[in-house]
Curated annotation (Swiss-Prot):
The lineage of its organism: Bacteria, Pseudomonadati, Pseudomonadota, Gammaproteobacteria, Alteromonadales. This is UPF0178 protein Shal_3046. HAMAP family: UPF0178 (MF_00489). Disulfide bonds: none annotated. Belongs to the UPF0178 family. Pfam families: DUF188 (PF02639). InterPro entries: UPF0178.
Length: 151
């Protein structure tokens, strides 16, 4: 089991949680981004840079992930592709995307896109607060405890 991170849009506080968990649980965490970013020295933390372009990092994650891998992303279409390939997707606010909820979440995203395209101001998400950080950490810990078997 590996953890893949859609790193370009992933908040720094979430990356820090992932870095700590990678070393503590000895789980491989790979950040995929279209630009270089600083990562701590660790045998469990990797950075894969891809070329710039629409969905290039997303496509790379889908190409590399295996069934049972965890992907950290707020990108709902990417989460849907991950689930279709047998992976698990978790957003930075601690919401687990599943086969049971991804279709309704995708429909809501598409509806909001339509609203924005028609000129309705929908606003963006609020900054990640303490409760979201805790929810993310809890979901991550539960997933790793259940699915990761250190070698």
């Amino acid at each position: 089991m590996k953890v893949w991170v859609d790193a370009d849009a992933c908040p720094g506080v979430i990356k820090e949680i992932l870095f700590r968990v990678a070393d503590r649980a000895k789980v491989e965490v790979t950040l995929v981004a279209n630009h270089w970013m600083r990562i701590p020295p660790s045998p469990f933390i990797n950075l894969k840079t891809v070329s710039s372009g629409f969905d290039v990092a997303d496509d790379e994650i889908v190409k590399l992930l295996s069934a049972g891998d965890l992907v950290i992303t707020a990108d709902i279409p990417l989460a849907s592709e991950v689930i279709d390939k047998g992976g698990v997707a978790l957003n930075p606010r601690g919401e687990l995307y599943t086969e049971q909820n991804i279709k309704s979440i995708l429909n809501m995203r598409d509806f909001m896109d339509t609203m924005r395209a028609s000129g309705v101001q929908t606003g963006g998400p609020a900054a990640i607060g303490a409760s979201e950080k805790q929810a993310f950490g809890n979901q991550l810990d539960r997933f790793i405890t259940k699915h990761h078997k250190p070698s």
